[in-house]
Amino acid sequence: MLKGIDPRLNADVLYVLRAMGHGDYLIVADTNFPSDSIARETVYGDLLRMENITAGEAAEAILSVYPLDTFVDDFACRMEIVGKPDEVPPVQQEVQDAVDAAEGEPRKMIGVERFAFYDMAKDAYAVIQTGERRFYGCVMFRKGVVPPDA
């Protein structure tokens, strides 16, 4: 156990979040996402797990230590609902709320078509599978930078 670090972040997840560099991106996936097979194609190459928590809870924990990229529009993306690309289901709204809280202001996640999201995920640094059972609980976070102390 460590002080000041969200206990939902296990050692493997913390290692990967720290190892990632500016512009690398992370997939946070629900239980229905083909996480294991896609994770094998990522930079890290193994599936990470944050089981027994929702996508929103995972996002909250991850974003407590992980800076989002402020230089790009696609700092965070969500998998679009097939046939309803503009609809944001509650599971994605919970993640959006975590993003807004971490950023201190509203920053809207960009929608990505389902199969395009799968393709994007293969180029990610890593995939974290959560315990989220609601459909479309899949998002991407692009890593930003931590500025130097003033």
Task: Give the location of each predicted region.
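Conserved phosphate- and dinucleotide-binding cores of soluble alpha/beta proteins
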Residues: G4, T70, V145-P147
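Short, glycine/charged-rich beta-strand-loop motifs at protein surfaces that mediate ligand recognition
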Residues: D46-M50, R78-E87
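Conserved active-site and cofactor/substrate-binding residues in soluble primary-metabolism enzymes
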Residues: G4, R8-D12, G21, I53-E57, ...
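Flexible, glycine/charged-enriched surface loops at secondary-structure junctions
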Residues: D69-C77, E105-G111
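Long, hydrophobic N-terminal alpha-helical segment
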Residues: M1-E51
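A phosphate-binding glycine/aspartate-rich beta-alpha loop in the early core of alpha/beta enzymes
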Residues: E41-D73
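Glycine-rich, aromatic-bearing surface loops/beta-hairpins
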Residues: G83-A150
